[in-house]
Structure formats: structure tokens, C-alpha cells
Amino acid sequence: MNSQDLKKRQEKIRNFSIIAHIDHGKSTLADRILEKTETVSSREMQAQLLDSMDLERERGITIKLNAIELNYTAKDGETYIFHLIDTPGHVDFTYEVSRSLAACEGAILVVDAAQGIEAQTLANVYLALDNDLEILPVINKIDLPAADPERVRHEVEDVIGLDASEAVLASAKAGIGIEEILEQIVEKVPAPTGDVDAPLQALIFDSVYDAYRGVILQVRIVNGIVKPGDKIQMMSNGKTFDVTEVGIFTPKAVGRDFLATGDVGYVAASIKTVADTRVGDTVTLANNPAKEALHGYKQMNPMVFAGIYPIESNKYNDLREALEKLQLNDASLQFEPETSQALGFGFRCGFLGLLHMDVIQERLEREFNIDLIMTAPSVVYHVHTTDEDMIEVSNPSEFPDPTRVAFIEEPYVKAQIMVPQEFVGAVMELSQRKRGDFVTMDYIDDNRVNVIYQIPLAEIVFDFFDKLKSSTRGYASFDYDMSEYRRSQLVKMDILLNGDKVDALSFIVHKEFAYERGKIIVEKLKKIIPRQQFEVPIQAAIGQKIVARSDIKALRKNVLAKCYGGDVSRKRKLLEKQKAGKKRNEGYWFCRSPSRSLLECSFNG
């Protein structure tokens, strides 16, 4: 193809993604679009086709973004090339959404005709507006008995401020309105800008590791053209590689002769080292490099930290390799090595939220077959010392001595909770119990209320979401953003087993709740730890002060049972032997206690 043909082809390209709150029908709509454009044969079609991970299918959520190419013949008789980038809906995967949107010019905003606008709908719309995307509202599930499309249309206009007069009324499940959506994409989503004759600039928006071909980059070509045989260069580190294959996903990988401006596809270049590529980096040609890198992505800072340890210590290197491969595919995951007296060698990992942490743990166990122990989640505290230093602490075991601490600041988030009016009282009570400060409350319509609180992140990462769902019978939707750091009365609580501190069980708690939390954990540990042949005291301590204690009574073994009579010195000898054995056991009894159960206890305490 010459330059003129490529420019004509570029005018026919439409790059778009689908954004929505969880369960508003995003993946189902993607399935219907694939069917309508005959991208996938009816034999290969299955529900949630783009959710290729088993975990995504089981949980019914999208975790990873997916990009596929479709061809659509519009009513004007022209054939258009669509690049559909499917995105997750959960707050923990906002980073995936922002990466998808950076590769698009338009976004289909799916809103449930019965539930209306939810907290995550708003968060995703603001991301799309930040990227200057053309937003096409779609009111989905109009075939539900509780559907009220007109009310939702007004909500879209009043709450988001988008013109919803031309919003498509659709039912992805029943296949209603799909053609109308495709026609709107053709008419309203702009073709990609960019110059096919300019030096190559390709944005890496995702990557995946292949055992045979190395790292495979998923890219959006912003300027220029790339083809097999080209020598490409990473603009962040200057590393060069020879392109072996380029292609697109349909959703299977299909090789192509080239990828040109506006295309979304993959590039394989025998990249063997995971560290050589970074999501958000710019790829250019080594012999004709671009003058500057593309804007890339804002680096996401982890909000929740936890220790990950292999149950078998010889799996430490396997765990490191597994984390590196997951990080390639999930740039928001961060990790560094750490050691624990109780658990040995492992990693301190940073996550965007609890669901993100849960998904990473499950992927490590399933995809890499490593049995893990996770410590209780923690957040980043700012500890100000008496010598006027500020230390960032994400691991309770790194907390300085209490005598050196002047004051501690903890992260607060702005929590936006959308809830039916009848549950407002329950939401406010829960938020206040979690040390939240009320900010404001708006009525979206006659029945639904948007409540905003400032809540400590540490309270949210434990059980806030579960408690919110149970206190509102599942009707509340929730979204949060980092707000600020505030001074708080925080203390480090240590758990002592048989007089020894167990570093993996330490946690940070507000002074007000210290006694209550300490008592709960001590009682739980008493039930979990098996009885020994000696008494084991379990204590919760703040510094030198013991705030809660419980004892596991000794298990008595009668070593004299086999002595029916005989000399007393024989009996004394057996008792002395038992006493020596008990003393020897005291040193390493913890190694045999169920460490996974201990950590689950501290996690749920």
C-alpha cells in the first residue's frame, strides 16, 4: 500500500472502548457487536468471549483489557475498521481503563436502564472526558421489567451533563439496538489523527509474556508504520529489537504485513527480558527515531500493601519470576523482597485495592501453581519522628520505636456512595463507625442519593465494602479517590505467642479501637493454634503494655501410664525426660502451627 492508500484507510478506522459500572452489560454488548460484525462464527461464540481468563468467567467481571479488530459494512456501503478495546468496571482496575482509553478516540457509555447511574459510571466518564473522547451514551437492559429509560436519560443529562437525546435504547442480551450503536460509532467517533509518513511512534498499552516468542507488545500506532524486519527502539531505555511479527487480534492473534497509523495490534520482537519493556513507553524505529516520546500514562501508586510468601521456601525464585511476568501484564503491581522471622523470604507487594490483591493471589496460585501465604493488608503511613524526619511506612514491622514517633498521618479517601434513600441511615452509621467525616449529600432523583464521606483508607481495605453491601442489601455502589493525609492517633499492635513477637501478625490500629481489635485477634488465635504440651500465652501489646491476653492450656500426656508399679526412680526418669522434651519443643513449636490460619485470623480480625 502506498502512502495515499494508507491515509484513505486511516479515515475508515474507528477506535473505541466500552465503559460501564460492574454488571451493566459491558461484556455482553461486546459479544453482540462481535456477532453482528460476524467477527466470530456462531460455532466459536460463547458468553463473555473477551474475558479469556478463567477467573474473569467465574467471577463474572472483566479484569484485563482486551483489544480486537472488527470489520463493519455501514449503511453508506463503506467498510469500516473498528478496534474495540474492552475495559474492566471495578474501581481497583481503573488503571486498566485509563490505559484502554488512551488508545481510543471514542467511548460507548453503557448505563443500566433499571439501576441508572452508579458510582463507577461517573468515575469512568471522568476518565473518558480527561482523554477528550467522544462519548456515546447507551441505555442498556431496556427489556427488564424494572427498566425506566426516560428516567435514566434524564440522569445522564443532569448528573453527568451529557446530551442523551440521541442515546441508543438497547438490550445487549436480546440483541436490540446493536446496529444503531454501530452506525453511531461510524458517524460520531472521529477517525484517528496522525501522520503515516512521520517517524514511528507507537504507544505500548499492554504486554504479555509468551514462552516461545518472548514479550509481545500490544500497541496503538500514533504515527508512522511498522512491519516485520524493522529494527525498533524503546524510547525510555534505548534498547533495540528486530521485529519478527506484527498483527491484530480477532480475538485470535492474526499476523499482518504491517501496522499503520491508527491501528491497534501486537508487535513480537524476540524481547526476552521482562524489564526491557514498560507499559506507557513509546516504540520508534532505530534508524529513523521520533524526536520525542508520547505522553504515556500517569504512574499509579499502590494504595494497599501486603506480604506474599511461598509456603515452600524453595519456591522463592519461582515466585519472583511469576511476579515479574504478572507485572509485565499489570503495570500497577509493585513488589520488593522482604524477610520475616516467622515466614522466611517473600515479597512486599503493592496493589490498587483489595480485589486487585485477591486477583493477583489467585492468578499466582492458578497460573504459576505456587501455594502462598498473604499477610494482612496495610496502607502507607507518614510517620513523623522527634528529629523532624518523615518516614513512609507500609509494613508494620518497619515502624520506628514509639519513643521516636512525634505523630503519624494516615491516608484518607473521598468515598462516593450511591444508595437508595431508605438505606441512607445505614450508610451514614457505617461510615461514622469507620471514622468517616461527612462531606455532602445530593439527591440524584426522588429515590437515589449520592453520599460523600472522607474515610481513612485503612478502614476501607479491611471490610468496608462487605459491610456496605450487607447493610444496604447489595443496592449501594461505591467509588473512592485518594484525598489527603491527616494526623491520627495510631498505634502499632504486636501479637506475642509464648512471649515472642510474631512480626507477620503486627498491624496498625487507631488507639480508640486497639483494645477491641486486640481482644478479637487473641480469642481467634486461641481457637486456631493447636494445644501444645506446655501452656502458650497469647498477648496483644502496644509497646510494653499488654492490652489483651488469652492462654492455650497445656495438653497433658501421661508418660507414667505404662508403669504399673516398680521403682520411683524409673518414674522420675520418665518425668524428667518429658520435661526436657517440653523445653526443647518450646523453641520451635511455632514452625508447626498453621501459619496460613494465623494470617487469615489477623486479616479478618
From Swiss-Prot:
GTP binds at residues 23-28, 140-143. Its EC number is 3.6.5.n1. GO terms for biological process: positive regulation of translation. InterPro entries: EF-4, EFG_II, EFG_III/V, EFG_V-like, EFTu-like_2, G_TR_CS, LepA_C_sf, LepA_CTD. Residues 11-193 form the tr-type G domain. Keywords: Cell membrane, GTP-binding, Hydrolase, Membrane, Nucleotide-binding, Protein biosynthesis. It is an enzyme of class 3 (hydrolase). It is a peripheral membrane protein. It is found in: Cell membrane. Disulfide bonds: none annotated. CDD domains: EF4_II (cd03699), EF4_III (cd16260), LepA (cd01890), lepA_C (cd03709). This is Elongation factor 4.
